[in-house]
UniProtKB/Swiss-Prot annotation:
It is found in: Cytoplasm. Residues 1-167 form the TCTP domain. Belongs to the TCTP family. Gene3D superfamilies: Metal Binding Protein, Guanine Nucleotide Exchange Factor, Chain A. This is Translationally-controlled tumor protein homolog. Keywords: Calcium, Cytoplasm. It comes from the Eukaryota. Its main location: cytoplasm. Involved in calcium binding and microtubule stabilization.
Amino acid sequence: MIVYQDLLSGDELLSDSFPYKELYNGVLWEVEGKWVVQGAVDVDIGANPSAEGGDEEGVKIRLVKVVDIVDTFRLQEQPPFDKKQFLGFIKRYIKNLATKLSEERQAEFKKNVEGAAKMLVSKLSDLQFFVGESMHDDGSMVFAYYKDGATDPTFLYFADGLKEVKC
C-alpha cells in the first residue's frame, strides 16, 4: 500500500486505495470521494425491559454518514476563504512548496501552477477546504467540491505537495 503524506506537515492525506486523475500537467490530482454510512448496532438481549420500566427497544442503531476520504485520513474542515485570503494562502503555499522541489520540478511546477490556481479561484465559492490531522498552518490544503449533478464530492490535491510512502 502507498500512502501520500503532506510534504510540509507529514500528515497522511491520501492513499493508492483512491485512484486519481492528473490535471494541469500533473499539478493537481483529482480524486472522487464517496459518502458512506458507518455505525454500530447495539443489541440488548437482556431481561424484559418493559417489566423493569426500561426502554422497549431491543436494538439501537447509530448510523453516521461520512465522506470516505475525510474519515479515513481524519481531514479537518476549515472555514471558507474569500478571494484575498485564498490568494494569500496560495502564494505562501507555492513559495513554501517550491523550496522542497528539485530545480527541474520547480520550473515545471511554476509553469503549470498558475492555471491550477486560476481554476481554484474560479470555483472558490463552491470549494470546501480541508487540512491534515495536525492542522499545520503551512501544510497542504485539500479542496473538495461537487461536480454538476454529483452527489459525492470530488477532491483536489496539489500533487507536488505529496510525498509517497510505501507501507
